[in-house]
Amino acid sequence: MLTDLHKVRNIGIMAHIDAGKTTTTERILFYTGVNHKLGETHDGASTTDWMEQEKERGITITSAAVTCFWNKNQINIIDTPGHVDFTVEVERSLRVLDGAVAVFDAKEGVEPQSETVWRQADKYVVPRICFVNKMDKLGADFYFTVDTIISRLGAKPLVMQLPIGSESEFIGVVDLIEMRALVWPGDAKGDVTMGAKYEVQEIPADLQAKAEEYRAKLVETVAESDDALLEKFFGGEELTVAEIKGAIRTMTVNNEIYPVLCGSAFKNRGVQPMLDAVIDYLPSPLDVPAIEAHDPRDEEKVILRHADATEPFSALAFKVAVHPFFGRLTYVRIYSGRVDSGAQVINSTKGRKERIGKIFQMHANKENPVDFVTAGNIYAVIGLKDTTTGDTLSDPANEVVLESMTFPEPVIEVAIEPKTKADQEKLGTAIQKLAEEDPTFRTEQNQETGQTVIKGMGELHLDILVDRMKREFNVEANVGKPQVAYRETLRRTVEKHDYTHKKQTGGSGQFAKVQITLEPLEVTPETSYEFVNAVTGGRVPREYIPSVDAGIQDAMQVGVLAGFPTVGVKATLVDGASHDVDSSEMAFKIAGSMAYKEAARKANPVLLEPLMAVEVRTPEEYMGDVIGDLNSRRGQIQSMEDASGVKVVKVNVPLSEMFGYIGDLRSKTSGRAVYSMQFDSYAEVPKAVADEIVQKSKGE
């Protein structure tokens, strides 16, 4: 473990699904000596994809943190997922990174998901270098990929290397700073070094002119960034390698440019120079600004925390995972101070004390125990009981709260029915564990059907959650179709509705009479129901009043229109009557429930549906098709604006119209548009659509 922070890099590898991100990470681990056998994503054996579903689908879901060493520098890699349903994981990893390597597919250029992840990295101001991967692929085109970085991302790439050959002829790269060729020996002879050795050669004659042209552009960009260098440049002096690298580092750390390198991770070419670039150009924890924290007792008070071992301890928990052997592992980024194994800290987000158990430096799924941790590093800790994703840990004498990560509300749900009683118990355990790991996953019990309803961020998200329940927790269950979470509400006031509950069957009977008024109530995040007791003269004994309230609330769970929960109701108990012998809490609960059901039918009940705030980023040429499609989905356009080479459309669309949208958007825009959506509000469903939903709910 290094305490010299100049030599530490906390980086993420970010990319579109299938651009070769996991293979690139694998190669880094191989060349830095952590892995002795290469795991290929194609065979489902890679080191960072350690959950079963990831191995099967060949996609990375959970960002595992891996530490490795390169030329006496320490690199902590956070593997980020590249699928749109996992953007919460991506955003979470970006919060704790200092820099990133953006991997692009040399044939496809900037793909939709690379654009989404790039925009998220912009939001967190993460410096990046670009690695144009898959140079060995049929149709690979380095120059086209660089053009798409400009046209689709609106970014300023700085070409640092040129490819020597492409497709099956790709053998190495031209290093434009040192003006030399790096060539990897062909592995047709079964090259035993797996690309670990390369030769430095003269630049091939047919590339000399192009190399000089790109070198001139590079030197000019460097010179313009610094007055002293500009003077030297105009004076006709050569800039030294150290001056060029220093200027590129400054510009990269400031997000002014993005160095571009190329290679083929799969064919083991170009990975080592990319590692050199990570060390040369990406920031160390000392290069990034101090993190802003708040005083837990005074939100307004800002406290700065620097990457300094002598400052009070502060850290952010950015991931909780369940390890098969150690149980609960909490991944933390240490922002300031140091902490020893066994020390007591405070979870300042929740105000609870925690004890740090064992501390590990993680290598994908192996772990290396350490005695203490210091600022600027990323570790996994066991022993934290109450800490979940996004919580701050700090020194009990100097509490701070690092800005909490805010997570969107889940919008899609699916019912799960365990097959046996034993499965019901396993499901309970699974839900608790998964909710600890993933803050965007919620559950509730459907009172009427007894089914467990799980909620998530999208169709793939729910698929994976259900899959994990079955596989990791052995839950056998029937799974329903994804459903939209509709609600009902009342639009009209119904005054003084009477209901009498009477049952006379020998012995003591049941008797309760109530008179209620129902009124529409504005729904706010705090209130969606209000009960008022306006009974005078003890006509309903005081002890029965809560029963009437409970009866009304029970009835509201299953709406009168289509059985969906009802919101936005003010119920007033106006009058009633009781019987000395036959009245009971149960009788009044039933009376309250039935009175509500009858009155609600007269109160003009309507259906509400979740509206999603959708943001689509599309190249201008597809704008007409995109808007036409959104209109056909009952979308209401909120705004249209320009952003670095693309049009941004903000629109509110009912969730029910968004199923399968990703496929339609891809086909309408050749996969170039991207969208994100999150819950906005509930709105009334138009009558024609509502009638259809009501009929469906009644099985007509």
Swiss-Prot record:
Pfam families noted in UniProt: EFG_C (PF00679), EFG_III (PF14492), EFG_IV (PF03764), GTP_EFTU (PF00009), GTP_EFTU_D2 (PF03144)
Domain tr-type G, chain residue ranges per copy: 6-286
Transcription regulation recorded as keyword: no
Organism domain of life: Bacteria
Transmembrane domains' residue ranges: none
GO biological process: ribosome disassembly
Keywords: Cytoplasm, Elongation factor, GTP-binding, Nucleotide-binding, Protein biosynthesis
Keyword Cytoplasm recorded: yes
Major site of localization recorded for this protein: cytoplasm
One GO CC term on file: cytoplasm
Alphabetized GO MF terms: GTP binding; GTPase activity; translation elongation factor activity
Binding of GTP, residues: 15-22, 79-83, 133-136
Subcellular location: Cytoplasm
NCBIfam families linked to this entry: EF-G (TIGR00484), PRK12740.1-5 (NF009381), small_GTP (TIGR00231)
Similarity section: Belongs to the TRAFAC class translation factor GTPase superfamily. Classic translation factor GTPase family. EF-G/EF-2 subfamily.
Function of the protein: Catalyzes the GTP-dependent ribosomal translocation step during translation elongation. During this step, the ribosome changes from the pre-translocational (PRE) to the post-translocational (POST) state as the newly formed A-site-bound peptidyl-tRNA and P-site-bound deacylated tRNA move to the P and E sites, respectively. Catalyzes the coordinated movement of the two tRNA molecules, the mRNA and conformational changes in the ribosome.
Descriptive protein name: Elongation factor G
Species per Swiss-Prot/TrEMBL record: Leifsonia xyli subsp. xyli (strain CTCB07)
Lineage, top ranks: Bacteria, Bacillati, Actinomycetota, Actinomycetes, Micrococcales
